[in-house]
Amino acid sequence: MKLADFDFDLPEEAIALRPANPRDAARLLLVEPGQDFRDLAVRDLPGLLRAGDVLVLNDTRVIPARLKGVRTREGSRVAVEATLHQRKAGHVWTAFMRPGKRLAPGDRVSFGETDDRACFLGALDATVKEKGEGGEVTLAFDLSGPDLDAAIAERGAMPLPPYIAAKRAEDEQDRADYQTVYAEEDGSVAAPTAGLHFTPELLARLAQAGVTTERVTLHVGAGTFLPVKTEDISEHRMHAEWGEVDAATADRLNAARAAGGRIVCVGTTSLRLLESAAGEDGVVRPFRDETAIFITPGYRFRAADGLMTNFHLPKSTLFMLVCAFAGTDTMRAAYRHAIETGYRFYSYGDSSLLWRA
């Protein structure tokens, strides 16, 4: 398959710069095999599910992973910006840095040195240990563990997606907006955005309707924003992300499905993790590892019956995933409908509920 097969025209004004308020007021496009599209709202979700169904939530928490700093080398100083990608050890992170060409192994970087909010921790300094492709580097920080986490939290900014960050600056409101209400496990540098639509009230209404929720963790990396650069999509390589499905959760998911319940993943992150944890037999097993699963049309889904997901960008791996899940022709038609009827796209945009083709 070619990258051009997943292209479509998306007006710039369709990209949402702020989320709906309240969260569950966002629109929801229902896509069912062989049925007309239905224009609803996220708050209608309890009426679209039935008792015994399970919503799988990604409980990762976004950290303020964008850091500005200065690279020093033999007296020269260059302003740089890092977006942390994945933690490798207590003091080691991989990151995407700009300008990557101005960095080399051994360089020292001081982050937030003009920002005195975290002075009590000392300087947030790091050494470039390795340099990869596309601006990816490995940083070894002088601080480690909780001290490093606190310094990043004080000095970092929320890592808004590029299409939003190019149009406005991150602000204090994003610290709340770009976080799900059920986030618990620190580690993501991008939000699992389908989950942003949930409110405590909506979760309570779902529970009253007999819909259960299960929590898994996938720490979303900055690689989720990277464009596909290969014309043949089979040549694209995903960045690995760490995830966990514990044994008790796996058992409950298997039992619910055996009893006739449908497994509905809230977001592509939950879906990719669940598919990584499931065997060819469809049984979900405990999983605690990295996954670089790349789902494209032709993939045979094992563990998920439904998917709630926002509207994705042209030629993105996530648009390829929804085409695999609900059918390429169906999703191209659904996206045409969404654009023509004013749905808002991307991380702060509206949502869809897809049933597997």
Swiss-Prot record:
Catalytic activity: 7-aminomethyl-7-carbaguanosine(34) in tRNA + S-adenosyl-L-methionine = epoxyqueuosine(34) in tRNA + adenine + L-methionine + 2 H(+)
InterPro entries: QueA (IPR003699), QueA_dom1 (IPR042118), QueA_dom2 (IPR042119), QueA_sf (IPR036100)
EC number(s) reported in the record: 2.4.99.17
Gene Ontology biological process terms, A to Z: queuosine biosynthetic process; tRNA wobble guanine modification
UniProt keyword annotations, A-Z: Cytoplasm, Queuosine biosynthesis, S-adenosyl-L-methionine, Transferase
GO molecular function: S-adenosylmethionine:tRNA ribosyltransferase-isomerase activity
UniProt pathway annotation: tRNA modification; tRNA-queuosine biosynthesis
Compartmental location: Cytoplasm
Family named by the database record: Belongs to the QueA family.
HAMAP family: QueA (MF_00113)
Function field: Transfers and isomerizes the ribose moiety from AdoMet to the 7-aminomethyl group of 7-deazaguanine (preQ1-tRNA) to give epoxyqueuosine (oQ-tRNA).
Subunit structure: Monomer.
Annotated protein name in UniProt: S-adenosylmethionine:tRNA ribosyltransferase-isomerase
Originating organism: Phenylobacterium zucineum (strain HLK1)
